[in-house]
């Protein structure tokens, strides 16, 4: 998915980013321009050699929002000699990763988190970096879902379908690590709210 691709590219060294929204009719011409501007057609070997030489490398991730009928383009650039040239040329406003955060459709944001030592000791891990990147729901989206569940608990005797719809919403939310953790918090909050309201198990 686009979220997984962005997370992978950032975790592998992208330091700057830019985002733009493009209508379907313009996507082909815009991608063509970006490909020429950032040399997006380089092979993996060519990108590797550029990085070894201290030259920045750019990746482009494209996400199509079916609801809004618009393409979200994420330009991800590594640190390097040519980064300054691109920035000075004023092509696109390249921001440092996390300043601001990369946000997808106002619902999800890419954040840096600290891993627990137990997770770092997992032999299945490919690296032991104490910090890692993951996606989570934005505070605004999280609060919207939380408020929905609070109301679903209150109206349950009259309309039990609201709680079922809430569970369906959670099942459709992107299942990446940081988001799964938030879902756990949301459900724990809902269970606690249910017990407080009805004095029984959900």
Question: Could you say what each language-model-derived stretch is?
Answer:
Residues 1-202:
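Non-catalytic terminal/accessory segments
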